[in-house]
Every structure is written in structure tokens, then in C-alpha cells.
């Protein structure tokens, strides 16, 4: 007979969004019972070091943990690690979650913050030796260990944010790195061309082989039989990565960095609306009023553009988790407190990426943005900024990408995006690095 327990708040997913939801709940409700269920053996941890400090050895696994044990004790949170929610029954009487150990948990409100899993490509067998993804802390530890034990040649398939960061980190520790991308340039297609070309050149200057316009056709594990093949640690075989261009890249470790697939299956089976993520309103409530969502899996209406989209970045996970927690608690305690009015998502989507010494920041909704306005000059062979490209739409700035830019300029760019100011009369000042962007933004806002 299944064991049954009841909690007021069930947090499904063991990432940063669920962690911050604890803070949001406790800011409203100090007494409600909270259960956090995560499928990893680690408590919630920070993901940014996975492609950087963990790989270089500058950050330990313990240092990635977002909070110490006393945080969970102080907030009276029970944490179930290495456990999955396998089913949700959202019956009108009492919703029930079934856990992987057979336990049934009834709940008042739930947060669905399951994030996503690494996308595997057709050429790779998930059980294949010497082929890995980089999504979890255990993935990063395994990549680091493989390289440390002699896996000196690494092929990375996918040159987006994670692929580029991983390439820089592996090159830093002395690995021979090849970066393979099916698109014609590295980094996301929506990013400005000068930045994408600069990152490619920067990686190339540090010994990274960059293959763009090249998809992987197959892996040839008979590479060990060819002269010069290097075995993977533990005596397993090296690979040859055969590309669509006819090129062949030898590697004793292949890392797939092809983005993520949102973990929506359990929600979809339960009848929750799904569209490349959990569909929600601006209070982060899903199509079932008892279930909220946050983090990488949440498809949220953008606070500036209004477009519903997923944002797969740390800042968004923190903000949305905190907001969802507050709103869940306001909702559950509405009958006894005057805190029933939920807050709406009002976050300017931001991201950052550290590729070696390059620090890139971005904000806004860059879909269909025109990147014709640049502040500073960025040439592949030139200095790494400071430089900002502004994404334009109807004479307003809707997004930016900044490389090694001053904090004051970044703050000013965010103000211009949030306030949707017409900048058509000050484009020369926006471009001119001698004119403080904060002064330009301040003048526009003052004269609105």
C-alpha cells in the first residue's frame, strides 16, 4: 500500500527556481509545509560554473551549492533528493503527486520547475562510451575527470552559450578542442553578427578548431585502429567525428551541447497546457489554478514585448522562482490574509556568458531585432570591447548585447528597453562612446 502524506506546497524540481520559491513562500506564509522533490542527488546548485570553474578545477562541487543545510532547516523544508515525480492527478477534490518510490503526496499548491534535459542528437547513443552532455553537476564532474585522466582531444558539438564556454575552459586547461556547429556561425542566430564573428576568432586564436556549417553525420569508433588515435581513459576507444563537409575530427571525448528539451511530459499527461514549456499567465499560474511554474520550463509572457517565451538563464530562474513562491502562498492563504492579489511578472530578461576573459551580457527580446546600431567597434582581430549592439524595432531599443561594457552603460540600456523610448533623435549620441549613455537615457526619459 502506497504511503501518503500531505504538504501545503510541493516544489517539483530541484533547481534554483524551486530554491528561490522557498524564500517567496516564506515571505508570505511562515507555517505551511514545504516539500522539495529533485531527481538529482545534489541539493539545488548554481549551474553557471558547470561549463567554467568546474571544468578548470577552480570551483569545487561543494562550492556550487546554492545554500547550506541550515537554509532548509531554518525554513522548515523537507528535501527529497534522487527522487522524481512520476505522475500528477489534478482531481478537483485533492491533487496528488506520485513519487518514484511509490509515495503519494497530496498538496495545496505546486510549483512545476523541472527545467530541461540535455538534447541528444541522432548521431550519439546515450550509452556510448566517451560521449557526454553537459547539463548537470555530475555531467561537469565527469567531463573534468575524463580530461584530467588524459582525455586530451575533445570535440564539442554545438557552439551556443554552453558550447563556447566549454571550449574556452577546456582550452584553458590544455585540451585540444574542436567546436562543431551546423549553423554558419557560432552562438545563437539572434545575436548580432559582429559579436558572433568575434567570439569565433577569439576561440580560434586560443587554439580551438571551429567548424561551422558542419553537421555531424556519424561517429566512427574504429578510430582507435588508425595511426595516432588516442584512447579514452579507462581503455575505451577514441572516436572520429565525421562531418557533413567531409572533414574528420578525432576525439577521445565528444561533448554534445545542443540545448535542452523542457521537461513537460508529466504536466502534459496531467492535462496542463504545454507549448514548448508550461504555458502560464503573468502571475506564473499554469492552466490549472493550483499549479505554478518557473525557471527554464516556464513559458512566460515577456514583460516588455508581451511575447510568450521560455528564458533559459539563471537570472530568470531566480526571479520567476521567487515570484511564483510568493504568489502560491498568497493564493493558498487568501482566505485568512489580505494578501490575495498576486504580483505579475515584471522582469527584463537578462543573461550573461563568460567565455574565458570575455564577458558578454544581454537583455530584452532579441527575436527579429535589427542590430544596425553599435556603440564602439568590434573587429575579429581587434580589442574585446567595450562594445554594445542595440536591437532596434520601430525606433525603440528592444534588446542589446554588450561585450566587456561598463556597468553604467548596461544599466542605461536596460532603462531604455524597459521604457520603450523613441531614440530616433539621439542615435548619434547612442553610438558615440564619448557621450555617456546614462546621460542620453536620462535626457530622453526626462523629456517624455
What would you call each of these model-derived segments?
Residues 2-78, 169-191, 411:
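Beta1-alpha1 glycine-rich phosphate/pyrophosphate-binding loop at the start
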Residues 1-12, 66-153, 157, 227-230, ...:
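FAD-binding core/adjacent interface of flavoenzyme oxidoreductases
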Residues 407-424:
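A short, polar/charged loop-to-alpha-helix boundary motif
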Residues 18, 163-164:
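N-terminal Rossmann-fold NAD(P) dinucleotide-binding loop
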Residues 127-150, 240-242, 247-323:
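FAD-site-proximal beta/loop scaffold in flavoenzymes
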Residues 423-448:
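Cysteine/selenocysteine-centered motifs that mediate thiol-based redox chemistry or coordinate metal-sulfur cofactors
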Residues 4-7, 27, 299-411:
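Mid-to-C-terminal Rossmann-like scaffold of FAD/NAD(P)H-dependent oxidoreductases
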Residues 31, 79-99, 105, 173-280:
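A Rossmann-like FAD-binding core segment of flavoenzymes
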Amino acid at each position: 500500500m502506497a504511503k501518503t502524506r500531505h504538504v501545503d506546497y510541493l516544489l517539483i524540481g530541484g533547481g534554483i527556481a524551486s530554491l528561490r520559491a522557498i524564500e517567496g513562500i516564506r515571505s508570505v506564509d511562515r507555517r505551511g509545509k514545504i516539500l522539495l522533490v529533485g531527481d538529482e542527488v545534489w541539493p539545488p546548485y548554481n549551474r553557471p560554473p558547470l561549463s567554467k570553474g568546474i571544468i578548470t578545477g577552480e570551483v569545487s562541487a561543494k562550492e556550487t551549492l546554492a545554500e547550506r543545510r541550515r537554509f532548509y532547516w531554518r525554513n522548515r523544508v523537507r528535501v527529497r533528493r534522487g527522487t522524481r515525480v512520476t505522475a500528477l492527478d489534478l482531481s478537483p477534490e485533492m491533487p496528488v503527486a506520485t513519487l518514484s518510490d511509490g509515495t503519494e503526496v497530496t498538496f495545496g499548491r505546486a510549483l512545476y520547475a523541472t527545467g530541461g534535459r540535455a538534447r541528444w542528437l541522432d548521431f550519439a547513443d546515450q550509452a556510448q562510451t566517451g560521449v557526454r552532455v553537459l547539463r548537470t553537476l555530475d555531467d561537469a564532474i565527469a567531463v573534468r575527470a575524463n580530461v584530467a585522466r588524459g582525455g586530451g582531444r575533445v570535440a564539442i558539438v554545438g557552439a551556443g552559450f554552453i558550447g563556447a564556454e566549454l571550449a574556452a575552459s577546456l582550452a584553458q586547461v590544455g585540451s585540444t578542442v574542436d567546436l562543431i556547429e551546423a549553423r554558419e556561425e557560432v552562438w545563437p542566430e539572434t545575436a548580432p553578427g559582429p559579436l558572433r564573428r568575434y567570439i569565433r576568432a577569439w576561440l580560434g586564436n586560443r587554439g580551438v578548431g571551429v567548424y561551422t556549417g558542419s553537421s555531424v553525420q556519424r561517429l566512427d569508433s574504429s578510430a582507435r585502429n588508425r595511426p595516432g588515435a588516442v584512447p579514452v581513459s579507462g581503455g575505451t576507444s577514441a572516436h572520429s567525428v565525421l562531418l557533413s563537409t567531409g572533414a574528420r575530427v578525432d576525439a577521445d571525448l565528444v561533448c554534445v551541447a545542443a540545448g535542452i528539451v523542457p521537461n513537460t511530459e508529466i504536466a502534459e499527461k496531467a492535462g496542463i497546457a504545454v507549448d514548448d514549456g508550461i504555458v502560464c499567465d503573468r502571475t506564473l499560474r499554469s492552466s490549472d489554478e493550483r499549479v505554478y511554474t518557473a525557471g527554464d520550463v516556464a513559458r512566460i509572457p515577456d514583460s516588455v514585448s508581451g511575447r510568450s517565451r521560455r528564458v533559459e538563464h539563471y537570472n530568470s530562474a531566480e526571479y520567476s522562482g521567487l515570484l511564483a513562491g510568493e504568489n502560491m502562498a498568497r493564493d493558498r492563504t487568501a482566505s485568512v490574509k489580505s494578501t490575495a492579489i498576486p504580483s505579475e511578472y515584471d522582469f527584463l530578461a537578462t543573461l550573461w556568458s563568460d567565455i574565458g576573459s570575455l564577458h558578454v551580457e544581454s537583455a530584452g527580446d532579441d527575436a527579429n531585432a535589427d542590430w544596425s546600431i553599435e556603440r564602439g567597434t568590434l573587429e575579429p582581430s581587434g580589442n574585446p570591447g567595450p562594445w554594445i549592439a542595440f536591437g532596434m524595432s520601430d525606433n525603440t531599443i528592444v534588446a542589446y548585447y554588450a561585450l566587456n561594457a561598463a556597468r553604467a552603460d548596461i544599466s542605461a540600456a536596460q532603462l531604455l528597453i524597459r521604457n520603450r523610448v523613441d531614440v530616433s533623435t539621439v542615435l548619434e549620441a547612442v553610438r558615440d562612446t564619448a557621450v555617456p549613455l546614462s546621460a542620453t537615457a536620462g535626457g530622453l526619459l526626462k523629456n517624455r
